[in-house]
A protein has these predicted regions:
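Helix-rich C-terminal or lid/interface subdomains of diverse kinases
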Residues: 184-249
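Internal "kinase-insert"/substrate-recognition segments embedded within catalytic cores
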Residues: 85-113
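Conserved HxN/HPN-centered segment at the entrance to the catalytic loop
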Residues: 46-57
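An alpha-helical support segment within catalytic cores of ATP-dependent transferases
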Residues: 104-150, 158, 166, 241, ...
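ATP-binding glycine-rich loop module of kinase domains
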Residues: 4-36, 43
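AlphaC helix of the protein kinase catalytic domain
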Residues: 77-86
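Conserved short submotifs of the Hanks-type protein kinase catalytic core
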Residues: 62-76
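Activation of the activation-loop gatekeeper triad in protein kinase-fold domains
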Residues: 169-173
């Protein structure tokens, strides 16, 4: 492999283009278990028939772990939204349609979302009483087994030149309640400084899925708490501001 064409830099990893491959190289010290789990997630999602880059190999490059997948030529939905603000509503419609397609799939060997969230809530920097309330609420939520992306945002969708969407970055994929995945996307859009887009997105999703907005709101403090254990201080503070169970009773 000749890795000199950087196409993206993310926390703990750098993505290169090598001909018809996209190679994600993880920083030294990155958890081997997390890397192998990401590759396994991607392989399991391939089997659902969703449009995703096929995984080609897991290897070592210059002493670092790397995952090689098909390179998908195109622009991210985030880029298209930036370049064509007049088409924002059209792109959000597509965004919601793709997410609903993800939720229509099942992958029974994926980690259970509820188990992962319980672990994360236990690690969150919140008081024991609030943690107890959140664990209790999580246990009371309906148990589903839909594929959840876990990081579904416009930068993780590539639109090819012929208009075909591909979904990338399956590191956080789980099976569980789709509304938790929607709450996560809503918070991601807020974190990106796009509160108006987040609200429009949620309205669209509720309309298309015929789901009450109050149901998603019940997930917000749970999802915010579980996500607060990673990210920088500003992100943690923002997410923890949503962790007020009483407000959503």
């Amino acid at each position: 492999m000749k890795l000199d064409n950087i196409i993206a830099v993310r926390a703990g990893k750098t993505i290169y283009r090598d001909g018809d491959k996209a190679v994600k190289v993880f920083n030294s010290g990155y958890s081997k278990a997390d890397i192998l789990n990401e590759a396994l997630n991607q392989a399991r999602i391939e089997e659902t028939g969703l449009n995703i880059p096929k995984i080609l190999e897991v290897t070592m490059f210059d002493g670092k772990w790397a995952i090689a997948s098909e390179f998908i030529e195109g622009k991210t939905l985030a880029q298209l939204m930036e370049e064509n603000p007049d088409k924002l509503c059209e792109y959000l419609e597509l965004f919601v349609d793709i997410q609903m397609q993800v939720h229509s799939k099942k992958a029974p060997l994926l980690t259970k979302l509820k188990d992962k969230m319980n672990r994360k809530i236990s690690q969150a920097e919140i008081d024991a009483t609030t943690r107890y309330d959140l664990h209790t609420r999580l246990e009371g939520m309906p148990k589903h087994d839909k594929v959840c992306h876990g990081d579904f945002n416009p930068s993780n969708i590539i639109i090819t030149n012929d208009g075909t969407p591909y979904i990338i970055d399956w590191a956080h994929a789980t099976q569980g309640n789709a509304s938790a995945d929607v709450a996560r996307t809503y918070l991601l859009l807020w974190l990106d400084g796009k509160a108006d887009v987040a609200k429009t997105y949620l309205d669209l999703f509720c309309k298309k899925s015929d789901t009450a907005k109050q149901y998603f709101q019940k997930w917000l403090p749970i999802v915010a708490a579980s996500q607060s254990v990673k990210g920088n201080k500003a992100e943690r503070d923002f997410l923890l501001s949503w962790v007020d169970v009483v407000d959503y009773e």
